[in-house]
């Protein structure tokens, strides 16, 4: 990097920061935090515990956004000041220090850009993520288990928690079906871009002839619905089936039919839960999963109407990403149209940049 490149970088980042300021409106956030502080000092505020919890959640989100905003703004302001001083004093070491810190500033601005993009109502919610292997038996079921590990590692890297709601092991390897509750900051905002069909091309470890196989798995992501979102589901709208639950690989086979499968008749949406030995608790969790799925479907319908897309095109049936292991190694996302060569790292959960590239490309379009 030379002086010209660094000067242009600072100009570009300053412009981005100015745009971010216009969207974030930090002054309004500070005022909102001050208002909530006043409310919290009122004894009446705590009488309604559910409302108090919602207001405090709002305060936490405002404070989190302000913290990230200030980190980015201070970084760019400090960099400009330090660079001007280095040029005035013709300090080559200080100029080199500025150049070395460029990537850190870019990362902070990018983090803030993503924060701005994750501003929809449910982006801050926890996520319910389900993986379903396509046709292809053991090969597809193994691919589903690879995706499961990728998402669990991704959540782990971000400090999010993962709860298995439903798990059905494959006959020989892999999984037939799995649903997770992933809890963490902006979990749904990030994971919503994973909705769709994931395609794998590799030489199958299950083929003695070592032939290349193509496998598919669908990923469905819904926001965990808060109690303040009212979704009414009547008993006549659903069909409830019970079955015996089993853990991963068949452990802890339950002799009673505690596992629950709920089918929403009108939409055909199916959810199931077997993470608890109590049928009552599994039903409650399955109903929550169903509400989340229906809410996600309604959000997609609304977006489609605005964009003029036919409802028949909505859903989780579009291929979004290809993972090629042979004859070369590459992962390509169809939304961002970006290819990645760090296949092993991505399958080990390093999917942050890939997700963020999709968010940015969707915003531009």
UniProtKB/Swiss-Prot annotation:
- Is the Nucleus keyword given for this protein? no
- In the record, N5-methylglutamine modifications are located at 251
- The record's account of how the chain is modified after translation: Methylated by PrmC. Methylation increases the termination efficiency of RF2.
Which domain of life does this protein belong to? Bacteria
Per UniProt, which keywords does this protein have?
Answer: Cytoplasm, Methylation, Protein biosynthesis
Q: What is one term from the GO cellular component aspect held by the record?
A: cytoplasm
One GO term in the molecular function aspect is: translation release factor activity, codon specific
The answer to keyword Protein biosynthesis applying to this record is yes
> In UniProt terms, what function does this protein have?
Peptide chain release factor 2 directs the termination of translation in response to the peptide chain termination codons UGA and UAA.
Quote the HAMAP family the UniProt record gives.
Rel_fac_2
Q: Belongs to which family?
A: Belongs to the prokaryotic/mitochondrial release factor family.
Q: Tell me what this protein is called.
A: Peptide chain release factor 2
